[in-house]
């Protein structure tokens, strides 16, 4: 019998946060417009996976048949023209199984392939839980990897502690299955560096008080960190998408994100 994920449905919270951020940050309007359209399709994919759970080895076929057509449709309707054109061309090419399979194996992919694979498979993982993700995925990220599927961390975030002067625990969120796990503070998620002098933190408190860049001078990588103590309404997965100025700031300092997000930033 398939182990299903928790009964919490994330879609309404993500929609509310995306709309709120789009109203506040004009630079994120285009990205969040596409993301809001994707959320509607991803909720349908999520429900389809719950209703007709595929076997782990059938995930590529399920994604192609049940998920990709809707992802392509909203990408054409709401996405940037370049991405929309590339997505349609890719959907009409051969080797769609490989498009999904390479993401499950964490192999190198063109931007459009990874976007399509992520958009199509993440709601299935969220619906069917950690054991399904572990069985469906074979590739394991270097450095810190998700204990559920082996994927790389997309971001880090701090939970509310319940006490004003107590810092909440730090978590990482998987780019592939969206699972979360605890991780030691002031430790690079890429190489394990712990020396404070090598771990700069950059932020822009006036515009983005809840998000900071967690950098590492040892491996020259970074993650965005979302602090719920600074904004309890934040939804880490959504906030990360809207922080292009912080991404550009980190890149200007020679840092590369551990893994680009859904839209390639």
PLM region spans:
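N-terminal alpha-helical interaction blocks
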Residues: 1-136
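Cys/His-clustered metal-coordination modules, chiefly Zn-binding fingers
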Residues: 129-249
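Juxtamembrane/interfacial segments around transmembrane helices
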Residues: 225, 261-265
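C-terminal membrane-proximal segments flanking the terminal transmembrane helix
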Residues: 246-262
